[in-house]
A protein has these predicted regions:
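Long, contiguous binding/interaction regions
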Residues: 1-61, 69-199
Length: 199
């Protein structure tokens, strides 16, 4: 087990004690949220900016992700809590949402897949940053679920660390409002550009 202070030890002691309940929660397709709510409370006692995500991977390993939900001030505590964690058989710990090649999300009536998004971007190579506009196929400005879905798509496809470190501004548009002279790229192409040109 790595060395960590009493605040971090308190969180990880709770996690180890409740490991079986967390595994049962993941295996049950997250039907009873009580243990997840306890986990959220424990993590926010450590730092109020942090949020937990629980899932399983294709190899049957349980995954615990800590995310600051795009808030830069949460980067340091996210890193600290994950790096202070113990080794637990059958578990992997991740700081930030990891980039995926495939991802979709449904929030109320907003159902979004990678193919439903085009990206406008303005790279600033000198300052290693990029401004982006997320363009949805059926975007409605009055429906805030589109923006929530957009930020989650960015975190999960482009990668939360890339978003925190390299994306300066995010805006939203409908496909119908994309200027004809502007070139659009996919979310996957955006991730590639950021990783190849801005680091």
């Amino acid at each position: 087990m790595r060395t960590f202070n009493s605040k971090e030890k308190k969180f990880w002691d709770w996690f180890v004690k409740n490991k079986t309940k967390l595994e049962e929660f993941i295996d049950s397709n997250q039907k009873d949220y009580s243990i997840y709510l306890e986990l959220t409370s424990e993590l926010k006692s450590y730092n109020e900016l942090l949020n937990p995500e629980l899932t399983g991977d294709e190899e049957g390993v349980y995954c615990f992700i800590v995310t600051p939900d795009g808030i830069r001030e949460g980067v340091e505590p996210t890193t600290k809590i994950i790096y202070s964690g113990p080794e637990i058989v059958g578990w992997k710990f991740f700081r930030f949402r990891q980039a995926k090649d495939k991802f979709g999300i449904k929030i109320n009536e907003v159902d979004v897949d990678i193919a439903d998004i085009k990206i406008l971007r303005k790279l600033d190579i000198e300052n290693k940053g990029v401004d982006i506009t997320v363009c949805f196929k059926n975007y409605e400005d009055a429906n805030s679920d589109f923006k929530t879905a957009g930020f989650l798509m960015l975190d999960h496809v482009v990668g939360e660390m890339n978003m925190l470190a390299r994306v300066d501004a995010v805006d939203f548009l409908s496909w119908n409002d994309i200027p004809k002279q502007e070139e659009t790229i996919t979310l996957l192409a955006l991730r590639k550009e950021i990783e190849e040109k801005l680091y």
